């Protein structure tokens, strides 16, 4: 993400009306890759809704040396958390749910490590990293790629994860509760998280 922002800032230093050549883009991208020690990147420049340049630079992996092209897909990792939170905010703006609604109102099967937390857990709590679970708690249910745990499996297994702090008292980065948030989006909108994000964001 920080590389995308830096590249966007570099490209924005040119006047809006100025024509930037492909060679100038190449130099900017190559300098950015060197500065951040990035092996590969795909770049697209879009103007007035049309792609004017789409190009890959470098390699996907320093081990395989397979080249990046304009169609190379990169994992976006935790950038999806922003999409999830934005999707929840859209549904809240549409009065379909509220930040302070209880998760069990939408997902009755949702259970945390104790009854109080389960019943008090709100939509807001799903995205604030203050559940009481430790950093990366339960992540082995989703990593490495290829894990066969489904969303419902993850929701069902949350109750077995032990807290490291009291509910809402400490920040610990979390991944699994965003999967729960995605299921709330599914339940409220009638669309899978993927379809909702694709259509609305």
Ranges and model annotations:
Residues 1-22:
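Bacterial Sec-dependent N-terminal signal peptides
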Residues 34-67, 99, 150:
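A short, well-structured edge-of-sheet supersecondary motif
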């Amino acid at each position: 993400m920080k590389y995308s922002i830096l590249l966007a800032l570099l490209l924005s230093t040119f006047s809006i009306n100025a024509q930037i050549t492909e060679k100038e883009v190449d130099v900017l991208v190559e300098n950015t890759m060197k500065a951040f020690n990035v092996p590969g990147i795909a770049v697209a420049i879009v103007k007035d809704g049309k792609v004017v340049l789409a190009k890959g630079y470098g390699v996907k992996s320093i081990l395989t040396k397979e080249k990046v092209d304009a169609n190379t897909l990169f994992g976006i990792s935790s950038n999806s958390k922003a999409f999830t939170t934005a999707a929840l905010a859209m549904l809240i703006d549409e009065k379909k749910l509220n930040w302070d609604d209880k998760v069990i109102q939408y997902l009755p099967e949702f259970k945390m490590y104790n009854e109080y937390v389960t019943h008090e857990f709100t939509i807001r709590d799903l995205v604030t990293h203050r559940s009481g679970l430790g950093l990366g708690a339960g992540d082995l249910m989703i990593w490495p790629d290829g894990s066969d745990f489904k969303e419902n499996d993850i929701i069902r297994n949350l109750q077995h994860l032990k807290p490291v702090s009291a509910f809402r008292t400490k920040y610990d980065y979390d991944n699994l509760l965003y999967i729960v948030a995605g299921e709330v989006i599914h339940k409220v909108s009638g669309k899978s998280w993927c379809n909702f994000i694709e259509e609305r964001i």
